[in-house]
A protein has these predicted regions:
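Catalytic core of pol beta-like nucleotidyltransferases
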Residues: 1-24, 32-38, 49-136
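Short beta-strand->loop micro-motif that forms the acidic, two-metal-ion catalytic signature
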Residues: 43-46
């Protein structure tokens, strides 16, 4: 369930008006939480049907800053490392969803990828622990 944040509607409207193919929008970080402070930025991640070019992310972040009066950290989910994506999926809020199946499939894929990463890391860390050194 999404907790309503006073700037969610403005953020959603701005993003969906400026970019096509938006499947989901996530708010994460301290904004909208008990940890939010007046100087907190707003962390937003978008899931689009395509990878969004960097210049469009920068332009949209600037537009959002003007509209909200707050610093905005805008990210394309498809360009983020799995360690950040899993935090967004598990701890963030999906504030907009135009393609529920696509968003849930992406979230599930992210969680599966993170589990695989941890399994691989476990073997590496176990090997380091047994050898008591990282190199050679």
């Amino acid at each position: 369930m999404t907790k309503k944040y006073h700037l969610d509607s403005l953020i959603i409207e701005t993003i969906t008006t400026k970019l096509s193919g938006i499947q989901a929008i996530y708010r994460y970080g301290s904004a909208g939480s008990i940890y939010e402070r007046p100087e907190s930025d707003i962390d937003i991640a978008i899931l689009a049907a395509h990878i969004v070019p960097y210049y469009k992310i920068i332009n949209l972040a600037s537009t959002l800053m003007g509209a909200t009066g707050r610093d905005i950290d805008l990210q394309d989910m498809q360009k983020l490392p799995v360690t950040l994506r899993v935090q967004i999926v598990l701890q963030g809020e999906r504030i907009y969803c135009a393609a529920r199946v696509a968003a849930e499939t992406y979230d599930s894929h992210t969680l599966s990828e993170y589990v695989r990463l941890n399994e691989e890391r476990h073997l590496i860390l176990k090997d380091i622990q047994q050898r008591e050194r990282i190199y050679g």
